[in-house]
Amino acid sequence: MNLYPKTFISLILIFTFVHASNEVLVGETTHVRDGDTFEIENTPIRLAALDCPENNTPEGRYATKIAKQFVGSQASCELTGVKSYERFVGYCSINGEDYGEILISQSACKVWRKYDVWKRYTEL
């Protein structure tokens, strides 16, 4: 029995599924949990490729304070197809600006290159 064709077809299907999951979620930012997690109309989103300090540190409280400025703003997130702790992971913009770049430029978060799967922040 020749397994090559079955393996090849399986790999194509997996590749297609992984890259076809670019769902976009658009809506109002209704809640901020911390620097890298917020909600669009009660749907939790984890920002892809960012590492923000936790809320139990002064740096984490600063990141959350910056993020809370955008509650009520229009958000658009390209979801990666991955979930982390029941949160959708995505690259997001707020009012048309890259949300990750905003947080990085304010020194609220850092790029987590290991998880920058779409290489959005390789130049930062």
Q: What kind of region is each of these model predictions?
A:
Residues K6-T16:
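Sec-dependent N-terminal signal peptides
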